[in-house]
Structures are given as structure tokens and as C-alpha cells.
């Protein structure tokens, strides 16, 4: 089983994340941020990755530290669960519609962290959640998972729909990229013979 647990504690947050890449999409997200928990639930459901997140953060300050640190820990957990990445598909892409919104997500599970994020949110907040934190989460996740990630909302008018299409698009792309290719079982998908540099 490709599983991992990451514990991360700072003066700002105390976080524990567990993932099972070969799960059923079961989510147990408890960050204290309702909208963010909703996005993590979507990520688990549509990636088929079991995700448990327990986070206590300085929400009296704002949601930034908790959102970013969950991205860091979840990225680290995915990276650890992947191990040497032998047999994975590595590459995947997804066009994700959400009503009037369409987002394109392309991923390379390469060990080479990079993020391109292009999404314009019409509103500064979704409920109490700052929309700028969507990019912050994707940045933290990509850097710590060691993935190259391109997220681009092609069009959209509703901030909730834009955020949701980004998370669902990542979920479906990640699901395909980390899946084991039976024709390449045990092979690292790189001419170098290794991933990560």
C-alpha cells in the first residue's frame, strides 16, 4: 500500500496528514475552515486518494498559515507515499468544467517542483476564505509533492466554481498520474532511470 503520514508542528499550526494513494476517496478533513475542508473533500473524492487532515491553526489571525501548512504537509505525504515512483503514469491532464467555468490542469509527477497558476477570481472572498489562498495552497502542495503543476482557468465568473474546478481538476489529473501502469510495472518513467532532478 502506498501510504504516508506527515506531522508538522510550528508556532502557528499543528497538522497531521495521512494519505493512501490506493484508497477509495475517503476524506476526513478537519481544519476549522469550512470552505477549505470542502475543497479537501473534493480532492479526496475525485482523486480516489484517502485523505485525513487534522489541523489546529492560528485562525484568529487569518486562514493563511493553516491553508499553506496543510498544502505543505499534504504535498510531503503524497511524495513520501509515492516512494521511487516506479510504475506510475507520471503525466496527466484534465479539463474540468464547473457550470460556466472551465479549468485546465496538467501535472508531471517528476520530482521537479514547479507551479504555473492562472486563475482570476471575481471576488476577494468565498464566504470567509480569501481567494488568494487558493494559489497559496497549490504552491505549497506542488513544491512539497515535487510535481510540476500547471493550473489555468480558461474562463469563469463564479469564484466558488473557479476554486472548485481547480481542486477537482487537480484531483482527476493526480489520480491518473499516480496510477500504476501495468505495462511499466516496476519501471521508473524516465530515461534517466530516476525521477527528481
From Swiss-Prot:
It holds the Pfam family IGPD. GO terms for biological process: L-histidine biosynthetic process. The keyword Cytoplasm applies. It catalyses: D-erythro-1-(imidazol-4-yl)glycerol 3-phosphate = 3-(imidazol-4-yl)-2-oxopropyl phosphate + H2O. GO terms for cellular component: cytoplasm. Keywords: Amino-acid biosynthesis, Cytoplasm, Histidine biosynthesis, Lyase. Its EC number is 4.2.1.19. One of its GO terms (molecular function) is imidazoleglycerol-phosphate dehydratase activity. It is found in: Cytoplasm. Pathway: Amino-acid biosynthesis; L-histidine biosynthesis; L-histidine from 5-phospho-alpha-D-ribose 1-diphosphate: step 6/9. Belongs to the imidazoleglycerol-phosphate dehydratase family. This is Imidazoleglycerol-phosphate dehydratase. It comes from Rhodopseudomonas palustris (strain BisB5).
Amino acid at each position: 500500500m502506498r501510504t504516508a503520514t506527515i506531522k508538522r508542528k510550528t508556532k502557528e499550526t499543528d497538522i497531521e496528514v495521512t494519505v493512501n494513494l490506493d484508497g477509495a476517496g475517503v476524506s476526513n478533513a478537519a481544519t476549522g475552515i469550512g470552505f477549505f475542508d470542502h475543497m479537501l473533500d473534493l480532492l479526496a473524492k475525485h482523486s480516489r486518494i484517502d485523505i485525513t487532515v487534522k489541523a489546529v491553526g492560528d485562525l484568529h489571525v487569518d486562514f493563511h498559515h493553516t491553508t499553506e501548512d496543510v498544502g505543505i504537509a499534504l504535498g510531503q505525504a503524497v511524495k513520501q507515499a509515492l516512494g521511487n515512483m516506479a510504475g506510475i503514469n507520471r503525466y496527466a491532464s484534465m479539463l474540468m468544467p464547473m457550470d460556466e467555468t472551465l479549468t485546465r490542469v496538467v501535472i508531471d509527477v517528476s520530482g521537479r517542483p514547479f507551479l504555473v497558476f492562472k486563475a482570476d477570481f471575481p471576488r476577494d472572498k468565498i464566504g470567509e476564505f480569501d481567494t488568494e489562498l487558493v494559489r497559496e495552497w497549490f504552491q505549497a502542495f506542488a513544491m512539497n509533492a515535487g510535481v510540476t503543476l500547471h493550473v489555468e482557468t480558461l474562463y469563469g465568473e463564479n469564484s466558488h466554481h473557479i476554486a472548485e474546478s481547480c481542486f477537482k481538476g487537480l484531483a482527476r489529473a493526480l489520480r491518473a498520474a499516480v496510477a500504476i501502469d501495468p505495462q511499466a510495472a516496476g519501471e521508473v518513467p524516465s530515461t534517466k532511470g530516476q525521477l527528481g532532478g
